[in-house]
Regions:
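A structural signal for multi-pass alpha-helical bundles of membrane permease subunits
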Residues: 29-330
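Short, Lys/Arg-rich, polar N-terminal cytosolic tail immediately upstream
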Residues: 1-28
Length: 330
């Protein structure tokens, strides 16, 4: 006896859903979007990519404004290694960066914490603290030139009230860079303060409430709630500070002209002197690309250390009993 095997009827192949025809309005909007995108892309190519390409070519020549131009290849880059003044400028820039970046972070975050309130006068203080950002460097430098005057400057007069003999800020090679750092922090912390304020206002209030109910003090709230919530914001601000520190020029140019004793000659200041002082455009272009690589490396290292992509993940760590683990994990 043979059994019959039932076979299921073959299914007809599914047809792909028919695509809806794109309306004329959608095509016009898409075309308009490309036109709007073409304008900034065109400006970026004309004013960024083309100059960078031309600078890359010039860096391989002995180009000068006056005279003939010859192809020298990598000679300009090899010359940098033996240029002792380049290492002096790089060391001064590194010193400036090591002082400016941490101080700029602390001042901007501290001011943002003080202004993250609902008082009536907060808006006034936010405006006042932002005024130096929109002021010209020459005006700011003039103010600080008088503030740092060794005899009659307000800063040294205030130090004298406490029996401290103020230094000769702009005339002492040990203090000139510190004076430039103080001026730069004062002139630029307003922008970073606004960025931190935006980050602070995005922190959920229930995290602070949970921490307070669990007995956390203000320092514990700041350490386990505020700082972890500002990881991305801190990464952005620190990156901007690093880039700005390596590109510092106008403060040193206006206040000290690179002195005393070349103690405030920065990388950009040195590039400016080589390009427009000595008219060595090829060598100045090579220095510019070396500076670009240095900034890129430090920015990547900063991104690696901060790891903004991991800020949203829950990470377990040991915390004091006064702070709930759910708050610390955020």
């Amino acid at each position: 006896m043979t059994g019959a095997v039932a076979t299921a009827p073959a299914r007809a192949p599914r047809r792909a859903p028919a695509q809806r025809p794109v309306s004329a309005t959608a095509r016009q909007m898409r075309r308009a979007g490309w036109w709007f995108l073409a304008v900034p892309l065109g400006l970026f190519v004309v004013f960024m990519l083309l100059p960078m390409g031309m600078a890359a070519v010039i860096s391989l020549t002995d180009y000068a404004i006056i005279g003939d131009t010859a192809w020298v290849g990598w000679e300009n880059y090899a010359r940098i290694w033996d240029d002792t003044f380049f290492w002096t400028a790089l060391r001064n820039t590194a010193r400036y960066t090591l002082m400016y970046v941490p101080l700029g972070l602390v001042v901007a975050l501290g001011t943002a914490l003080l202004l993250n309130r609902s008082y009536r006068a907060v808006r006034l203080f936010r405006t006042l603290f932002y005024i130096p950002v929109v002021s010209s460097t020459v005006a700011t430098a003039t103010i600080w030139y008088w503030l740092l005057n060794p005899q009659k400057g307000l800063l040294n007069v205030a130090l004298g009230w406490f029996g401290i003999d103020g230094p000769r800020w702009l005339y002492d090679s040990q203090w000139a860079m510190t004076a430039i750092v103080l001026m730069s922090v004062w002139a630029g912390f307003g922008t970073n303060m606004i960025i931190f304020l935006g980050g602070l206002q995005g922190v959920p209030g229930d995290l602070y409430e949970a921490a307070r109910l669990d007995g956390a003090n203000l320092w514990q709230q700041f350490r386990y709630v505020t700082l972890p919530s500002l990881t991305r914001t801190t990464f952005l601000v620190s990156t901007l500070l690093i880039i700005g520190a390596f590109q510092v020029f106008d403060q040193a140019y206006v206040l000290t002209k690179g002195g005393p004793g070349n103690s405030t000659v920065t990388m950009v200041y040195y590039i400016y002197n080589k390009g427009f002082g000595s008219l060595e455009m090829g060598y100045a272009s090579a220095l510019s690309f070396v500076l670009f690589l240095i900034i890129l490396v430090f920015s990547l290292v900063n991104a690696r250390l901060n790891r903004p992509g991991d800020s949203g993940r829950v990470r377990r760590r040991r915390v004091p009993a006064a702070v709930p683990s759910t708050v610390a994990a955020r």
